[in-house]
Amino acid sequence: MQTKATEFDQISKNIFYPIYPVIAQQILAERKGISEGTCLDVGSGPGYVGLSIARQSKMQVCLYDMDQNALEIAKKNINEALLEDRVFVKYGNVEEIPYPNESFDLVTSRGSLFFWQDKVKAINEIFRVLKMGGTAYLGGGFGNQKLKDMVDQKMLAIDDQWLVKAAMRKGCADDYENLLKKTIVKQFTVKEDDSGLWIVFHKTSEPTKEQH
Ligand SMILES: C[S@@+](CC[C@H](N)C(=O)[O-])C[C@H]1O[C@@H](n2cnc3c(N)ncnc32)[C@H](O)[C@@H]1O
């Protein structure tokens, strides 16, 4: 049976594939040359963001998703990439991450935030599992304008509603600013440029008691 996860994997493999290494590079640039540590890729789907991060760094990467079918595909992709020693899958919802406080140096998430039911709870969870000095890079995008144009053109050929759906999902910088103000994250950046729309924050201090 063709599941949603299989369909997304096919699109990622055949159309999106050049965007992932570019996005991984942009994410790792936020870590300013630190190429070791642990990374949680939330809403990983078939895992191409996390796998690209693993290829471009020495990080241990957890591909985390609440769709078991997506994780089965992710496992195959990990094996094909020969990255079983550094990349693994874990099932769960972003709103309740099954890891202790301060477990990850980097939390990434591309193309998933739009689907989260309780985004405030989810972002607070991400902040909780980030190590001190850790970075979160959450949102959506296609790497750069040229890649976005290529994806739009190919997606429009198979779905004439692609641009409408993509615009509806994307939201805007103001929505993200307002969302973040409701969370325990006090310092963050919302960047909207050719790379997409992303929330970036670094964990530099614990939230105060009132913020818990
Ligand atoms: C459009 S796919 C993006 C996959 C991948 N990040 C990429 O960019 O290729 C969105 C993924 O987010 C996952 N997802 C949605 N809501 C989630 C949640 N609350 N917790 C964990 N994963 C979630 C879905 O199961 C799906 O695999």
Predicted regions and their residues:
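Short alpha-helix
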Residues: 166-184
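A conserved beta-strand element that flanks and buttresses the S-adenosyl-L-methionine
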Residues: 108
